[in-house]
């Protein structure tokens, strides 16, 4: 089982989206790559902790290649927007790909270079090793499953199983 962490705006929609992809085994939302210990949602929203709202993904690499997972990620973010996705603004809403396995970096960078060809503006998505990850509060986990009419910056048609 492999792991990758994606930040792409509000983590509710990011988690719901990746749960529709065959080969994704587990997801959880939380706070990635910040500079305090055990932050709360309220802490992260102050814009002072350095954390990104993120989705931690475990996937079966025999069934789902990292390239396909990253391609899916690019479909639901605007990687040229700094600290913003949809109506959400702030450093916690930045885009980021945080890797656990150093060997994944080459695949991530190749995908970013390919994606850059679609844009005139530079891609500002962070690509960094995962420094730390803290689980978000329980009410955030699988939020859109519990609240189907909840806010989501990702189009609803992309949240159907595929």
From Swiss-Prot:
InterPro entries associated with the record: Met_Sox_Rdtase_MsrA_dom, Met_Sox_Rdtase_MsrA_sf, MsrA_MetSO_reductase
Keyword Oxidoreductase: yes
One GO cellular component, as annotated: cytoplasm
GO molecular function per UniProt: L-methionine-(S)-S-oxide reductase activity; peptide-methionine (S)-S-oxide reductase activity
EC number: 1.8.4.11
Pfam family membership, one: PMSR
Active site residues according to the UniProt entry: 10
Regions crossing the membrane: none
HAMAP family named in the record: MsrA
Protein family membership: Belongs to the MsrA Met sulfoxide reductase family.
Protein's name according to its UniProt entry: Peptide methionine sulfoxide reductase MsrA
Species this protein is from: Clostridium acetobutylicum (strain ATCC 824 / DSM 792 / JCM 1419 / IAM 19013 / LMG 5710 / NBRC 13948 / NRRL B-527 / VKM B-1787 / 2291 / W)
